[in-house]
């Protein structure tokens, strides 16, 4: 039995080293900063209703996957980025401010994901909060948002963040 255990541990060795390398590569890099800058600029466009700025940071096929409460539990709403930008830039709708905090960024080559808390504020008051999950790809040397998924709740959001 001992030779079998030794063989198993030896076989596991490269996988353990590979997993350790993957964890170490999760340390912040220039790509992490670029990904966050892309998201921050997109959210600045949201805050100022600047559809040109928002569009600069999304792929033409980008989607928003929104989980919203419904009578039988969460329901999924899908919007194209174009539909979303039209909706949030309408002059008859209040401007939205959606800061994020505590982002967790993962980058592997040309693919990135970011998980972060968010608050949506309307006229300085917290409307709702939850978590955003962004997926981005580096296309033509630029990070582009492919998808934003979020959760939604109206309670437990706290005061507006600084």
Place the predicted regions along the sequence by residue.
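A short local loop/turn or secondary-structure capping micro-motif enriched for an aromatic residue
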Residues: 64, 73, 122-124, 138, ...
